[in-house]
Design a protein with these regions (language model features):
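Conserved beta-strand elements of the Class I
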Residues: 2, 55, 75-77
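Short beta->alpha connector loops at strand-helix junctions that form conserved
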Residues: 80, 99-103
Length: 140
């Protein structure tokens, strides 16, 4: 079993020789802008998106923290339960956060979500898909 929430990887670690080769060929004196743009273009092409619709980061935590900082002023809205870092990063940047509570079977009714959006008027709504911790995949 791979515990993705613990950042476990199904891949074997690189060998010392592989790491040495990677480090030897890395250009540490330049920002990796060219590689980043190539990655975005390739990812966008694969998913039939525009590169402007793609942002990459050093894991989901970095991107969640950035969202909490750059989104318009106002509360965030998230599912409850869901990934605990939504609340942690909202608290870190003093952003209010409200929640849509799960039904007893850990599912979320779309009407309840829409009603909560209407009530809270959040700056943005954030959710994990598949849902954490139930693993339910939502068709968006």
């Amino acid at each position: 079993m791979i515990r993705i929430n613990k950042n476990e990887s199904p891949l074997r670690p690189l060998t010392e020789a592989q790491l040495t080769s990677i480090i030897h060929h890395a250009s540490f004196n330049f920002y990796p802008d060219e590689e980043y743009e190539r990655f975005k273009a390739g990812y966008a092409r694969y998913y039939n998106l525009s590169p402007d619709q793609i942002i990459a980061g050093n894991g989901s935590d970095e991107l969640i923290q950035k969202l909490m900082l750059i989104m318009p002023e106002g509360p965030a809205l998230a599912l409850n339960p869901d990934f605990f870092m939504y609340q942690a990063y909202a608290d870190q940047v003093h952003r209010p956060i409200a929640f849509v509570n799960a039904d007893n079977d850990l599912t979320f009714n779309l009407e309840n979500i829409l009603s909560r959006i209407e009530t809270v008027q959040p700056a943005f709504f954030i959710m994990s898909n598949p849902h954490n911790p139930s693993g339910k995949q939502y068709n968006l």
